[in-house]
Amino acid sequence: MNIFAPIPQSMKILFTITIFLAAFSISIAQGYKVTLQSSDYNGGIAYLTYYYGKNINVEDSAAVNSKGAVVFQKNEKLLPGVYSIVFPGKNKLFDFLVDKEQIITIKADTSDLINKTIVTGSKENILFQEYQKFVGSKGRQLQKELEAFKASKNKSDSFMHEKNYSDLNKELNDYRDNIIKQHPESMLASLLTSMKEPQILNSKPVTRDDSINNYQYYKKHYWDGITFLDDRIIRTPFFLPKVEKFFREVVSPAPDSIIRESDYLLLRARAAPEMYKFLLNWLTDEYINPKYMGQDAVFVHLFEKYHSKGISSWLNEKQMTAISNRAYMLMSNLIGDQAANLEMVDSAGVSVPLYGVIADYTIVCFWDPTCGHCREEVPRLDSMYHAKWEKEGVKIYGVLTENKEQSKWREFINKYNLQSWINVYQTEEKKKEIDEAKKPSYKQLYDVTQTPTLYLLDKDKHIIAKKLTWQQIDDVLEMKIKKPVNNINNAGK
């Protein structure tokens, strides 16, 4: 549970608290020393960890002595952020802030971590400990009001508990704002500012314009509390969720919108190496295998503008090779681009290039008769095609992906009556010619890593959709070829 998390306004969302313990002290010229004492332990290994994205990474480890003391100490300074000490058994941890002062002492009582723990040597963490106590107290009251609200049997009780909840929530937010005002230079103030959400102008929009204005205001002010030159916030539990929410919920899923926002954030972070690295790594991981069709254009953009220019020098050779190979597999098949021509021949050896196919819509199907999934899906694709789309002028360009299976390919075509398809394959001579010219293969051009792989092209062979099931192809065609409803028979009724 995370006490840094913003308190939700809605009564429908459960309030949760994370117990954070702080320890910090007077900084020394070099290195750090973190001491923890607890009579609840007399041996084992404890770990000093820090938050980074969704991970809790181990910074150091040390043995707990018979008196329950453990010391973490090195000559190098810790990078600022939110750290934790994980006790033996890994079932308890103490969270604390690390900034300039890095001599830290914590005397912990696990029977009441918030109220019985003593922190010395760190003004930053003393402030943090007081904040914990306040949040813990208000959190229990908020939970009580929430449960009472759920158990309310009439509107009067519901209204009362909802108001109490709102008042308590305001007290908590006011307390946070006061820390920011009274201790503006503190790390806690910086973190609390980073967490703040934009206040919506019209909390209850009435018109569509109200909703649009709310969205635009929220998006415009989403990053107001974030200083992208402050690397400390990447080592916290709340920064990654804020980034994820922005790109997954706030920004339009259209690739151009994501690209524009990605470039903007990277521009703001370019003078902060760790922040820049964090953002570029996350964006690359998010869009190398995107959830939505077409968003692979974001990954290709990141590769072309950043990775291919040597900017991501922190990546090792294996990582860079994987990113490069994936980018090259996607460059030629982005949604909206013209698909690469396929110079294939039919079963009689007659040349039938893709660009020679005249049709308003062309389904390109890469398949293999020995593929179990193909044996199931290809007949279903054909049934859908005959039932709905053949009469609309749609054509299927079926590409055999394994030349050695030509006899089984012909048998399959005859068995399932696929003669209405344009059935083709690439000759060994053509494959050799392409290889010798060091040109990309059709499997690279179309990112064919499994079969069946389906593409939908328009009359000019631009890619409308790709990597879909036959059902999804059917849905897309339904939208594209949807005929106007004939209302003649309903006239006058």
Q: Where do the PLM segments sit?
A:
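Short active-site neighborhood of thiol/selenol oxidoreductases, capturing the structured segment around
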Residues: 352-381, 395-397
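Bacterial Sec-dependent N-terminal signal peptides
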Residues: 1-36, 482-484, 491-493
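Structural microenvironment flanking redox-active thiols in thiol-disulfide oxidoreductases
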Residues: 376-416, 432-439
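A cross-family structural signal marking well-folded subdomains
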Residues: 256-315
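Charged, long alpha-helical assembly modules
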Residues: 195-269
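N-proximal helix/coil linker or "cap" segments that precede and/or mark the start of modular domains
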Residues: 289-345, 350, 356, 386-387, ...
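A non-transmembrane, solvent-exposed segment enriched in polar/low-complexity residues
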Residues: 30-184, 191-195, 199-225, 229
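Thiol/disulfide oxidoreductase modules built on the thioredoxin-like
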Residues: 195, 418, 428-479
